[in-house]
UniProtKB/Swiss-Prot annotation:
Gene Ontology terms describing biological process: transcription by RNA polymerase II; transcription elongation by RNA polymerase I; tRNA transcription by RNA polymerase III
Subcellular locations according to the entry: Cytoplasm
Species assigned in the record: Methanothrix thermoacetophila (strain DSM 6194 / JCM 14653 / NBRC 101360 / PT) (Methanosaeta thermophila)
This protein's encoding gene: rpo5
Protein name, as recorded: DNA-directed RNA polymerase subunit Rpo5
PANTHER family on file: DNA-DIRECTED RNA POLYMERASES I, II, AND III SUBUNIT RPABC1 (PTHR10535:SF0)
C-alpha cells in the first residue's frame, strides 16, 4: 500500500523545518523568544512527516489571494 504524503495535498501549505541558525535569525529579526511563537504539536501530521522535534521552528508558506504568499512560524511543542 502506498503511503499518503500529507504535504502533497493541495490544501496543506508548504512546511519547512528551519535549521538552528535560521531559527535564531528569525527570532532576532522579529525580536521575539521562541516561546512567544504560535505552537504546533510534535504529533501534527506534517510535523511528523518532516521529522520535527520539540523545540524546532517550522516555517509555513501559505498562498494568499491578497499578498500572494504569507509566511508564518510555529514552535514545535510536546
Amino acid at each position: 500500500m502506498k503511503r499518503f504524503a500529507v504535504q502533497d495535498h493541495e490544501l496543506v501549505p508548504e512546511h519547512i523545518l528551519l535549521t538552528p541558525e535560521e531559527a535564531q535569525q528569525v527570532l532576532m529579526q522579529y525580536g521575539v523568544e521562541a516561546r512567544h511563537l504560535p505552537k504546533i504539536h510534535v504529533t501534527d501530521p506534517v510535523a511528523k512527516e518532516i521529522g520535527a522535534k520539540v523545540g524546532d521552528i517550522i516555517k509555513i508558506k501559505r498562498k494568499s489571494p491578497t499578498a500572494k504568499e504569507s509566511i508564518f512560524y510555529r514552535l514545535v511543542i510536546d
